From Swiss-Prot:
EC number of this enzyme: 7.1.2.2
Organism lineage: Bacteria, Pseudomonadati, Chlorobiota, Chlorobiia, Chlorobiales
Organism of this sequence: Chlorobaculum parvum (strain DSM 263 / NCIMB 8327)
Record SUPFAM superfamilies: C-terminal domain of alpha and beta subunits of F1 ATP synthase (SSF47917), N-terminal domain of alpha and beta subunits of F1 ATP synthase (SSF50615), P-loop containing nucleoside triphosphate hydrolases (SSF52540)
InterPro entries noted in UniProt: AAA+_ATPase, ATP-synt_VA_C, ATP_synth_F1_bsu, ATPase_a/bsu_AS, ATPase_alpha/beta_chains, ATPase_F1/V1/A1_a/bsu_N, ATPase_F1/V1/A1_a/bsu_N_sf, ATPase_F1/V1/A1_a/bsu_nucl-bd
Full protein name: ATP synthase subunit beta
Compartment annotation: Cell inner membrane
HAMAP family noted in UniProt: ATP_synth_beta_bact (MF_01347)
Amino acid sequence: MQEGKISQIIGPVVDVDFPEGQLPSILDALTVTRQDGSKLVLETQQHLGEERVRTISMEGTDGLVRGMSVANTGRPIQAPVGAEVLGRMLNVVGEPIDGKGPVPSKKSYPIHRSAPKFDELSTKAEMFETGIKVIDLLEPYSRGGKTGLFGGAGVGKTVLIMELINNIAKEQSGYSVFAGVGERTREGNDLWHEMMESGVIDKTALVFGQMNEPPGARARVALTGLSIAEYFRDEEGRDVLLFIDNIFRFTQAGAEVSALLGRMPSAVGYQPTLGTEMGELQDRIVSTKKGSVTSVQAIYVPADDLTDPAPATAFTHLDATTVLSRQIAELGIYPAVDPLDSTSRILDPNIIGNDHYDTAQAVKQILQRYKDLQDIIAILGMDELSDEDKLVVARARKVQRFLSQPFFVAEAFTGLAGKYVKLEDTIKGFKEIIAGKHDSLPENAFYLVGTIEEAVEKAKKL
């Protein structure tokens, strides 16, 4: 094993000198043994001349000193894979952080792997039911597809991701991998305890590199989670779910690493390699003929600006987008999904059927008409509208409220039992509202209920 010596430490950047001709390859993992016997992992990023490499640390560099010995592992960071990682919480280098002892996995994958070849990819389009009305009706997720949850600060991205994990794990009993990338540690802790209570934890692997970690860990933790998911897809032929919260932090950490390595920044201070890094990650999240990886990625939108380079780069890779809107959250409608801004590639009658497609288009049409009429209502009031338009507004407001739904993971906050709504019940409910079958019911009856039958029951109590 080649050994080198630390020559310079600048925060998370560590320069290491090796004897001439023994430089580690780019992306190879190096290990430093601290005085207390624990190991710190560095990842090789640049070759500076004949004998020096510049590395990024995966943990804080406190306690490191110049002259310390560094060992070259001769391969990239390895993630433990297989059934042994289910029910466990790991960090970026695959070490357990749940206090349950070592992970006895028989196999490990490098976190840097090439994407599957074109001829191995699967191209079939199939809808994936989530039990959340607004998603299933208007922007259906595809099995083996990529979905982005876009939203500014505090509009409910993490709650929505947690609800999806809950619904899918309970209803579809598939394996899930959750990668917590640069988000709040409290949220990771809540997720861990909720999963243990609901029993979902046995089918989930969690990988965390949260806000308090150095940028190297945050820039790599998504890849660790992805390698675990790839094992289940390629070697066990499973349909896996990969949740990443938050993909923006992956880009943000990449920008920090890029600046630390002295690269010239590009637009808005992001790294010049933004598109490449995102592409390398997203190109691995695909479905092959062996199995599928269905991914749901929360994407923070800085200052609610969807044209910012980070969310804009992520947009190009997605099959469906769920855009969370502050205006809708302000109305108290949760999940605060913008039904007119959200899209899906499989919202196509050939894939989802005419009944679903026609209902979705009718819902979008009535909401768009209501949006167009809002200026007139704001200036002249409701009385100036024609009878036909008054009817449109009344039905649109009912549709808008019926798009809300009580969540299982938010029961403690709302005091309402969570609801999983099957697709046929969702379609039936919206068809009836648009056809005018429930014109006599107050709009409040449709707020935070599951099926249309529940709305009718609620109306009797109002």
